[in-house]
Amino acid sequence: MAASRNSLQNSVPTRVAAFLAKRTTPGEKVCVGLSGGCDSVVLLHVLTVLGPREHLRAVHVHHGLSENADRWADFCTDYCRRLGVELLVERVDVERRSGLGLEAAARAVRYGVFSRSAGDLLLLGHHQGDQAETLLFNLLRGTGIAGAAAIPVDRLQGRMRILRPLLDVARREIEAYARDCQLVWIDDESN
């Protein structure tokens, strides 16, 4: 059992390290979008395990849409303090009458915060399950071939590159890594 636990702990960091080695260069300012959920908690933990990154920080966007939003921000603040990672908590107002659905409006505001504060690279914790879910949703909406691309692993938004190092990792592997490393996370009731 210990051997399989060690291989799980090594698998996620090894895959993230290989992903970043292909797509990043030393000295780039790296920011993690930290919701406090399992995926982003693991991603930030892995980055600290891989070694010191002088330009590593996290951003938590406080949408205020849940009665738990303050607790989530406090959790992220405490987590980053324990890891020794700088954290920016940005409180935002989501325009509910924007013509977008609430989730799409929140996403637009969130990416606005990221583009102002992320630096060179924004790393997000989307995983295989998110990819499959997005693909299915897009196909059901009738997006055709364009929707089959689902979530891009690497894309440019303005001057910021958005990378998703966990996109080929299964949710169960991420959760197993978190349990093996005794990480805690928050569960968003809307997710």
Regions found by a protein language model. Give the residues of each.
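Core alpha/beta nucleotide-donor-binding catalytic domains of modification enzymes
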Residues: 2-191
